């Protein structure tokens, strides 16, 4: 490889075939390989790699890309969202046997996963010695000068990978499968650099994620929205929906940080009115497209409890589907994500099946809102 790799060469270093972002030695490998073979329509590991490389080659002409970020290092005391991307893709293939063909028709390209070293979060938290050691482990065949510039942590890899994606296709819509909600940060950060129009973020979430830092950590699941709002200059383009688990009242956040919030009780009382008020707010600000960052815990825990911090008295799935559709019809959708789906967390026997199934419903609606066509 040349000292200065092309964007596609670098993406091939940073990413892995879909499902391959999890570092698996033996346990779980068979399930991972089955997913890859179904998604790429092949029968061997060598063919999987060829399918992955071919997908990268289609980025420039894609309308939307799918990226998995299987990291939950930015979460709290209950983990498991690192398994979200694989579970969501697997369920999607179960529901839509012809998904690979349909995706190709619609211009959806699955570019795979960020490779997630399971002990790391962001490169700015690491010593130079640690970065050097991990670079050598991840990129052993890359020349020293090129290797020294490569990121090693999930958030840092994702941010660089998305910068490269936008170099190849500045208007492509990113659709990201998390991962804890810290994994939305590299997406919105890269979008902020790539797009110069007035886009906004709509964030269904039980929590505000508006701490400036948490225990001294700048970017994690509880802080990413604060820093997103700073990128916007606190101008009201961050809209939060379904808030209900907060140390402070609505006025604290809206007056202090100039975010717009629709708390869960208001959404439950007047769902249609909330949707229209939300859209009206965005239109008045001149927003020309939204990134829909969908934390599954924004949904009531009766429907979505396989997650790190499930909360009752939340949003109903039909409300969120109606919101996604209305945003697609009005201001438009430039991308989105599904965050905090944690398949191992089963408070009830059917927790995983129900939560992952709902995540796939939201994912399909998000694609439809972006592409103006059903998936």
Language-model segment annotations:
Residues 2-375:
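Conserved alpha-helical scaffold segments that buttress catalytic/binding sites
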């Amino acid at each position: 490889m040349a000292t200065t790799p092309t964007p596609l060469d670098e993406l091939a270093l940073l990413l892995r075939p879909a499902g391959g972002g999890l570092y698996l030695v033996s346990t779980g490998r068979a399930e991972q390989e089955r997913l890859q073979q179904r998604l790429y329509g092949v029968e061997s590991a060598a063919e999987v790699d060829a399918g992955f490389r071919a997908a990268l080659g289609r980025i420039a002409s894609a309308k939307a890309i799918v990226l998995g970020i299987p990291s939950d290092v930015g979460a709290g005391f209950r983990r498991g969202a690192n398994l979200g991307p694989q579970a969501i893709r697997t369920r999607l293939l179960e529901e839509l046997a012809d998904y690979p063909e349909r995706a190709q028709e619609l211009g959806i390209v699955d570019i795979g996963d960020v490779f997630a070293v399971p002990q790391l979060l962001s490169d700015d938290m690491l010593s130079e010695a640690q970065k050097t050691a991990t670079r050598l482990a991840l990129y052993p065949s890359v020349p020293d000068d090129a290797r020294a510039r490569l990121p090693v942590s999930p958030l840092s890899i994702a941010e660089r990978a998305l910068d490269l994606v936008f170099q190849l296709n500045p208007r492509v819509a990113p659709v990201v499968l998390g991962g804890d909600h810290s994994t939305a940060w590299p997406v919105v950060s890269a979008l902020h650099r790539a797009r110069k129009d007035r886009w906004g973020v709509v964030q269904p979430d039980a929590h505000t994620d508006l701490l400036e830092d948490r225990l001294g950590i700048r970017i994690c699941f509880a802080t990413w929205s604060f820093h997103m709002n700073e990128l916007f200059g606190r101008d009201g383009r961050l809209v939060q929906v379904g808030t209900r688990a907060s140390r402070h009242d609505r006025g604290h956040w809206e007056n202090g940080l100039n975010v717009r919030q629709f708390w869960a009780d208001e959404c439950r009382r007047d769902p249609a009115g909330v949707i229209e008020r939300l859209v009206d707010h965005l239109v008045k600000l001149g927003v020309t497209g939204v990134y829909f960052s969908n934390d599954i815990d924004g949904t009531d825990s009766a429907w979505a409890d396989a997650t790190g911090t499930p909360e009752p008295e939340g949003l109903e799935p039909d409300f969120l589907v109606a919101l996604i559709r209305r945003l697609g019809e009005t201001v438009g959708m430039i991308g989105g994500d599904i965050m905090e789906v944690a398949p191992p967390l089963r408070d009830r026997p059917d927790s995983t099946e129900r939560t992952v199934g709902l995540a796939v419903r939201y994912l399909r609606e998000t694609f439809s809102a972006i592409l103006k066509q059903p998936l």
